[in-house]
């Protein structure tokens, strides 16, 4: 459960209380992964081997064809994104690659989206090629899980690496399952407020979001008041 996960972090960090910001700290500082984009891509090609040679070849071709905007540049949008909605056009991927584990995980995630779009567009007519956001995240998180499993095999016997990688997987589960469910519930609350004729103000939305966080995390984590503003920075 979510409360058990908060308790695990409390024990791992040996702290009296887990705050919301403690959920984003790495489980250990004794493991650090540094790699270039080329190294990350070569590793990704190994990671997706279980998905078949055709999948590997298309992933390899995306890099060779310069379909990925890799590095941060002035005035470039933050984050990462896969643009695959143009039917008949190979998906493009935007990254702001960082030479560390998070950079590798983001690459794997976005290429999962790109490959989903590629196969959907190549196997479905235009009218049926689109997919829901919920289904889209299956393809991307699958690549994340494959990446963690591959890294754990590469670092077998390294306790610090195992702790870091398992912690990364657990945090991914929290943000992909629990956090996204909370976002969906917040959207439903906002729509219900509007349909009931209630004004959608910063104060009312912040109060609703704060109450949601207390319901989800209150049993194992101190929900600081500032978290009520988090909904404003979630783009999608």
PLM region spans:
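Cation-handling catalytic/transport regions enriched in His/Asp/Glu
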Residues: 1-236
């Amino acid at each position: 459960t979510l409360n058990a996960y908060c308790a695990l972090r409390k024990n791992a960090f040996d702290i009296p209380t887990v705050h919301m910001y403690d959920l984003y700290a790495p489980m250990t500082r004794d493991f650090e992964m540094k790699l270039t984009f080329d190294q990350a891509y070569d590793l990704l090609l190994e990671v997706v081997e279980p998905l078949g040679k055709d999948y590997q070849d298309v992933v390899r071709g995306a890099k060779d064809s310069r379909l990925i905007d890799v590095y941060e540049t002035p005035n470039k949008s933050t984050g990462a994104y896969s643009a695959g909605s143009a039917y008949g056009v190979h998906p493009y991927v935007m990254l702001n690659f960082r030479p560390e584990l998070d950079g590798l995980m983001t690459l794997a995630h976005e290429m999962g989206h790109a490959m989903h779009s590629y196969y959907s567009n190549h196997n479905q007519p235009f009218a049926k090629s689109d997919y829901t956001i919920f289904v889209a995240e299956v393809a991307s998180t699958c690549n994340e899980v494959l990446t963690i499993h591959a890294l754990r095999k590469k670092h077998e016997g390294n306790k610090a690496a195992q702790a870091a990688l398992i912690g990364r997987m657990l945090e991914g589960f929290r943000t992909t399952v629990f956090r996204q469910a909370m976002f969906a519930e917040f959207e439903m609350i906002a729509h219900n407020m509007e349909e009931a004729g209630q004004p959608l103000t910063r104060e009312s939305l912040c109060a609703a979001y704060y109450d949601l966080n207390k319901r989800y995390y209150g049993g194992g984590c101190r929900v600081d008041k500032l978290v009520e503003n988090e909904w404003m920075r979630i783009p999608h």
